[in-house]
Amino acid sequence: MKMKRFIYGLTVATSLVFATSCEEKLDELLENPNAVNAATASPDFLLNRIQLDYQGFWFGVSDRGARLTRQINQGSALYEAAYISGSTNGTWSNAYANILADIKFLEPLAVAANLQRHLGIAKTIKAMVLIDMVDTYDDVPYSEAIDAANFNPKTDDGAAIYAAALVLLNEASGHFTANPSTGTPNDYFYNRNYTRWVRLVNTLKLRYFLNTKLVSASESRAGINALITENNMLRDTDDFVFQFGTTAADPDSRHPKFADQYTSGGGDYQSTDYMWRLTEDKGFDDPRARYYFYRQSLTNTTNPAEQECITQLPPPQYLIGGFPYCNPGTRGYWGRDHLDPDGIPPDGLRRTAYGVYPSAGRFDNNSATPVNNPQLGGRGAGIHPIMLAAYVDFMLAEAALTLGTTGDPKAYMTSGVRKHLNYVRSWSLTTSEGSVISAFTPAADYTRSVDNYVTFVAARYDAAASSNDKLNVISTEYWLALFGNGKESFNLYRRTGTPLRMQPALEEKPGAFVRTFLYPNNYMVTNTNAVQKPNLAQQVFWDTNPASPWIY
């Protein structure tokens, strides 16, 4: 018994000594060895994550804009039903919890290591995110955001955030040319061609001045003229795109529109209005139509179980305005009208699908077979056309016409049209659909169709009676070139009120058009300083145009 007590006592004493000696190390033991901190973080990996998160963020913003501007179908009968407080939760969290937080973490690491190119890319993306957030919501948290000591940041004025983004763009240009610079970032966009990054920055400045032209025409005019004089914006081959792959396994590297539609059919409905503009409006097919859309059927259905609207009269506002309804023509271009709330009939392998551009689906060579096979077409190796060289010409055309900046608006417009028509084909030929495209449309035939199209558009511009009519021609052609980029389409519509004659909603009174979105639910329930907007009709600071229904 005495021996047992001795052993027990010795064990307790030893344990106490051990515990005492470890007490000083307790804080160290509580640290997670797998947690990323400033000492262990890789600036390269951080920048990788920032770039990947940005493409996802941009896609969410772009997709909503495309639906609102009739580039693809917008479901729901009313705008307020289509876009509730929770509709943009992902955009908000991706911006703040991912991209902006990671950039804030990256910046001091990059400064300490003199990673100038990392800083240039990060600040360019930061500026784009800030501008996109203002374009989406107007006032958002900025100066008090991403602060571990402040869980309830207040919003900043949208105009002030825009100005801060312009400062970031100027700083980014300096980082792209600074010497010396260490490090070789993994650049998903330009493969470390920093001359192109500088041209992108200048192009983003052009967009900044164009968006703010209604706030300060003189500042915008001077800013754009300076950029024209410098002559260093995006040119052919400088297109700022995110390139997808063909891997279906997790993580799926394919274009999201392809993955959604070509796996088992179904997916988005195309916009009846947009397809009509590309296939019927001019009396001949837009050369891009077969690249944008793939018809799973070459004829319209006669079965109302597949397409209910074929047995129904158009709404009164369609009849009075002479708008396309239900189907754009008779050749199997099968989509839906704006704000169509109907359910989903068995038409997944009949409705018009996404084509080869930009989501790397199939080129429409009249084969008219279902798209329920992920090995079809370009297999999803598509792109996000975030900022193309052709867009520069359209923006300069608008600026020349509305601000009187240097240059001829018609020449800019026709240059943009030709540049985009050629880009759509040249890019599509790089996909696995290249041989199909060349066999169906030889290069000489496509060139002839491009020439004819440009001639027609130029004549339409010349025939436009007023400046606003001429602006409508420019904007319509820009809008048609923006397939895959609803962000710029949404801004164009709010900024100019054009294209005119957008297809109306099926409901006669769908509510006010979305000028900015409601603040998301995940912000409203976590920030005590958050104040929700009264409705979707609140306008971004640079949109000083009349209230809706100026646009609808």
Regions found by a protein language model. Give the residues of each.
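Terminal processing/anchoring signals of secreted or surface-associated proteins
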Residues: V12, C22-E24, I50, A127, ...
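Sec-dependent bacterial lipoprotein signal peptides
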Residues: M1-T20
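Beta-strand acidic-aromatic groove motif in beta-rich domains, primarily in extracellular
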Residues: F59-R67, D138-V140, R221, E488-N491
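C-terminal functional modules
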Residues: H420-Y552
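Short, compositionally biased low-complexity segments
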Residues: T20-L29, Q71-Y79, V134-Y142, G434-D451
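Membrane-proximal, proline-rich intrinsically disordered regions
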Residues: C22-T69, G75-L78, G86, G90, ...
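Structured, solvent-exposed acidic/aromatic patches
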Residues: Q71-S428, A464-D469
